Amino acid sequence: MNKIRNSTYFIFSCVVSLILFIPNLIKSTIGSDWDSYALIGTFYNYDLVGLYTPSRPPGFPIYELIIGIIFKVLRKGSLLSPEQGLLIFQFFLVIILNFIVYRFINKSDQKNYLFYLLIVFSPMYLISGGSVIDYFLGAIFGFLAIYMVLHKYSSNYIYAYLAVLLSLSIGIRLSNAIFLIAILLYITIYKKNYTLSIYTAVLTMLLSCFIYLPFYANLYSFYTVNNIYNSPSEMICLLNLTNTDHTFIDRLGRFVLKQINFFGVIGFVLFLMLIKNARTKITENNFIFFIIFILFQFSFLRLPTEEGHLLPAFISLLLVFSNMKNFNSKILIATLTFTFLSNFVDFKVYSVNSIDSASDISLNASVTKGFFIEDYELRNNIALEKEFHYKNSQSTLFDAWKNGCPN
């Protein structure tokens, strides 16, 4: 009976996700961010021109390839539009990540499923999950690797399973190497299995190289033929991020504000009240999640743009708190309620001069549309000219990369 009752949380979350997914499916809108369209442009340049032009440095080859193939196949004629096919694929990823998070909660001592709902009903979780972007697929493989090392450690050939999962996660997004670092530290410090650490590290790096090198070699070949680069060392520019010309204060402002967006203003205040007396020690069970949280936060501080990059940190932090005792249940329920409501209506206590830089912040209380509603309207407006965005992303990416790295 307990298993049936506990699984209700997972089923309920999937039903809510489905309800919120349907409007986007009907409208066939793949996202409010240009990056969603850039993925298609990357695939078309590779498929039609024979040149790999990353949608963003340093490239996201596995996800770009998957999205491009789905788009191309459905473009030839199907009951579904290409956009609907991509959205259905993305929805399955949401269900899979929901289940992985649910399993972590279910394996914990406290089994606090309200934290599970707090994770999966966060506006940034729902928006990222409903957008054609790489965050969810990369997180799925990363957290599967964590699940294996925590709960399937005695499996035969675990180093091979870990290497495959981690290399897939890294092949989707290079910054997911943080999952590898956290797992290696855990195996070394708590399991003291240095052989497993070495095997996992070496095999993961080899497999990751097999994923990235063919695409990078394609781009380097183009540069050498056109006398743009003469040495492979010049390709290190692929690791440089774009749009980093902001002051530390600018980045810090954006960094702080985007943390709030996971809960909404009221939800964030309630969350701080909830955890203000929380005390926890780093243990074998939560060490990996602490490392994931810290390293992804530092990575985000370098370029605090899309909140989706913080999803592993957000999930990890709440998984740590979910296994702690003596939380005020009323405040936790209130936090969950207002976090979910912030998808539809949000109470702002500040305004910024620019969403992207947030260099000037003023106190200004107002009630605004929620994050999910704002994203829904924006993606609908962008989709009105989706054919333009597909073609424009292809030409824009080619122009950006044809003379060398754009950064």
Locate each region found by the language model.
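Membrane-interface alpha helices of multi-pass inner-membrane proteins
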Residues: Y116, I158-R173, I181-L184, L206, ...
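Hydrophobic/aromatic-rich transmembrane helices and adjacent perimembrane loops
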Residues: I172, I178, L303-N328
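Short acidic/glycine- and proline-prone juxtamembrane loop motifs at membrane-interface regions
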Residues: W34, R56-P57, I127-L137, T305-E307
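Membrane-lumen/periplasm interface segments of specific transmembrane helices
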Residues: S197-D250, V256-G267, S342-D346
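Loop-to-helix entry region of an early transmembrane alpha helix in multi-pass inner-membrane enzymes
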Residues: P57-P61, L65, R75-I96, S128-S131, ...
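Hydrophobic, aromatic-rich transmembrane alpha-helices
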Residues: N2, C14, T188, L257-F287, ...
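Membrane-embedded, lumen/periplasm-facing catalytic core of multi-pass transferases
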Residues: L39, T335-N407
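Signature aromatic-anchored transmembrane alpha helix within multi-pass, membrane-resident enzymes
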Residues: Y9-C14, Y113, A160, V164, ...
